[in-house]
Amino acid sequence: MLNVHEAPNGFRWRIVPERNDSCVLEEGMVQSDEPGVYLEGEYGIRHENETVVRKGEKNEYGQFMYLETITFVPIDLDGVDPDVLTQYERKWLNEYHQAVYDKVSPYLNDEEKAWLKHATRAI
């Protein structure tokens, strides 16, 4: 059985030697991206997407890689305060939601499309 947290690759805010997940990312590796916030003793919220490592720019500093999203699920806008987003963050969210709608809606019936259209509305 596969798990999104299998070695050898992983991102953490600190190194955990026993996890053995500090490796060089290689093209084709799948990596979960799980931004979140946790309020101690209260609750936590996390949004998770799966990404695949792709080759990006190569220059005098070496080969750069980037993460391409491969799962497309709306971010719940009920949990987003647009007033605290920067222009860049708002643009990113709107573009991400447009990609979600464009990629997923062809597989949905009219009722499901209407739900997805609302869930991915621009802010």
Where in this protein do the model-derived segments appear?
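Charged, cofactor-coupling segments
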Residues: L2-I123
